[in-house]
Design a protein with these regions (language model features):
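Active-site and adjacent substrate-binding regions of carbohydrate-active enzymes
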Residues: 1-220, 224, 229
Length: 229
């Protein structure tokens, strides 16, 4: 909110564009949140601050009123209609960068596909949506393998400070039980997409010969079942 409400941010971005990116005809991608409906043309297009920006329309569907613990389930029809609306709207100005997941979001396979429907076919369909939309598909590491959430069942396995603080505050205040909060973290924690890339079925999935900063994806599919090799 501090950045959103400060006058002159647009002028600063224009100065940045003029004196850096524009000199080299550089392609730029912005990350913009809480943008008003009539502001898209200020950020992309011929006169925009950036060449394009990430489209977070689908991700905003799982924003709870108070955080993760009351985040709503992503309904398929709402998800479909939201993406379609965004695609139509952006055509007036240019194109956007389409994403399914990133380092701050849970894995798309676990987030958008009902657990009972997760399969190679449904994973490929989700990938097809991302690459066939108008715009630029951005692929996050592990997404090309169909990696899922990690589903850590112990708080000690998490490294994301937001996840740890969120769990601690809500359980110590008595607002939520530890069991409920663990389920929330399994679904929404940023650590779900921050586990090491799985290269093969060797120790540590071929990512390192040492100990990684965080556990591997140790539930099904395991590194033996899901790796680049």
């Amino acid at each position: 909110k501090m950045v959103e409400n400060v006058d002159g941010v647009g002028e600063f971005l224009e100065d940045l564009k003029k004196n850096t990116f524009q000199k080299y005809d550089a392609f730029t991608v912005g990350e913009v949140f809480n943008m008003k409906a009539d502001e898209l043309g200020q950020f992309i297009g011929d006169n925009g601050h950036f060449s394009t920006i990430f489209d977070f329309c689908a991700h905003s569907l799982s924003d709870g009123a108070h955080g993760w613990y009351d985040a709503p389930h992503v309904d398929f029809k709402t998800w479909r209609d939201t993406i379609l609306s965004s695609q139509i709207n952006v055509q007036k100005y240019g194109l956007e960068a389409n994403i399914i997941e990133n380092h701050d979001e849970p894995r798309g396979v676990s987030h958008y596909i009902p657990e009972s429907d997760v399969s190679d076919t449904s994973k490929k369909m989700l990938a097809a949506v991302n690459v066939m939309l108008r715009g630029l598909p951005f692929i996050y590491q592990g997404q090309e393998l169909g990696m899922t959430n990690v589903y850590f069942d112990k708080l000690e396995d998490y490294r994301d400070i937001e996840s740890i603080n969120f769990f601690t505050e809500l359980t110590e205040s008595g607002l939520m039980t530890p069991e409920y909060m663990m389920k929330c973290l399994m679904l929404r924690s940023r650590d779900n997409a921050r586990t090491p890339m799985q290269w093969d079925d060797s120790k540590q999935a071929g990512f390192t010969e040492g100990e990684p900063w965080i556990c591997l994806l140790y539930t099904s599919p395991s590194p033996r079942d899901l790796s680049t090799s």
